[in-house]
Amino acid sequence: MKRDLYETLGVKKNADEKELKSAFRKLAMKYHPDRNPGDQEAEKSFKEINEAYETLKDPQKRAAYDRYGHAAFEQGGMGAGFGNGFAGGSAGGFSDIFEDIFGEMMGGRQRRSSGGRERGADLRYNMEITLEEAYSGKTAQIRVPTSVTCDVCTGSGAKPGTSPKTCATCQGSGRIRAAQGFFSIERTCPTCGGRGQTITDPCTKCHGQGRVTEERTLSVNIPTGIEDGTRIRLSGEGEAGLRGGPAGDLYIFLSVKPHEFYQRDGADLYCSVPISMTTAALGGKFDVTTLDGTKSRVTVPEGTQAGKQFRLKGKGMPVLRSNQTGDLYIQIQIETPQKLTKRQRELLQEFEQISSKENNPQSTGFFSRMKDFFDTLSE
């Protein structure tokens, strides 16, 4: 028993033309024989969805099907006049949508130029650099294994003194058409593999491919201020094209190593610096080494608290392709003394005894406010 045509396309019986076309496009891409070589079930499904769409997209045929079902198109049936040839104007409509749907799928044909030339594949190279290198920029030498144009046949794939011949099967188009019922399907030519040419006497070095594998050394310019995850494109430095086709591109994917002291946020840098409790209380100075190798002095005022930030203007990262520079932020961490001697402990205890609320206004105020808060709740 034949399947319901609406069920075949996966649409409701009141589906409009737009819904029918969308469903057909999706299913045709899924079951097309070129995407399922040798799969008889897929080929059967492909024929069914084409038959369903061709029927339902035509208002007269759809009306007949809605009234009589499949009997409308059977010989001698109630709607036999509609037939199964789909001749006349309807064929053009199917051809248009067929080309529209499979134009993208036949992209391999579009990538090939005359003579079976194909563009080479793009390559990816992962490079890791230091934060210092991202700061100052550099020129790096990299070695990339890739396919390059054969120097014996100059990319033609044919033995010197000979040349490729136009494929007799497809007449150089790289595609052949095969009739299937009321429509024809375009396939890759099995003789030339879609190249449009055949090589009877291939080059002995590249074996007819027009390219060979080797390792190349390339120079890569890393600009100042480059960020983690940046992609650099080297046009034409990918794999050589097949049979004299254009080369692909090489993409350098950069990653910046984590730094031992600095964290980066855009063009700004951050550094946490531990200082002693006495330096925080009495004040002091210390030097930090910036990414350009110079030293910058940071002055710590008396009574500096943990988390205090000091901004060193213009000491951050260069902004890519500009004259601007970010800032460096120094965040203070106060280190609590450990492994105290007896004398140190005595001095700290004495200091605690002679301290007043004014010496620790934040902690005194905090505990006072906490006590008042909970006292209010208990009333």
Curated annotation (Swiss-Prot):
Family: Belongs to the DnaJ family.
Domain remarks in the Swiss-Prot or TrEMBL record: The J domain is necessary and sufficient to stimulate DnaK ATPase activity. Zinc center 1 plays an important role in the autonomous, DnaK-independent chaperone activity of DnaJ. Zinc center 2 is essential for interaction with DnaK and for DnaJ activity.
Name the record gives this protein: Chaperone protein DnaJ
InterPro entries: DnaJ (IPR012724), DnaJ_C (IPR002939), DnaJ_domain (IPR001623), DnaJ_domain_CS (IPR018253), HSP40/DnaJ_pept-bd (IPR008971), HSP_DnaJ_Cys-rich_dom (IPR001305), HSP_DnaJ_Cys-rich_dom_sf (IPR036410), J_dom_sf (IPR036869)
UniProt function note: Participates actively in the response to hyperosmotic and heat shock by preventing the aggregation of stress-denatured proteins and by disaggregating proteins, also in an autonomous, DnaK-independent fashion. Unfolded proteins bind initially to DnaJ; upon interaction with the DnaJ-bound protein, DnaK hydrolyzes its bound ATP, resulting in the formation of a stable complex. GrpE releases ADP from DnaK; ATP binding to DnaK triggers the release of the substrate protein, thus completing the reaction cycle.
Record carries keyword Phosphoprotein: no
Binding site for Zn(2+) 2: C167, C170, C189, C192
Gene responsible for this protein: dnaJ
Pfam families in UniProt: DnaJ, DnaJ_C, DnaJ_CXXCXGXG
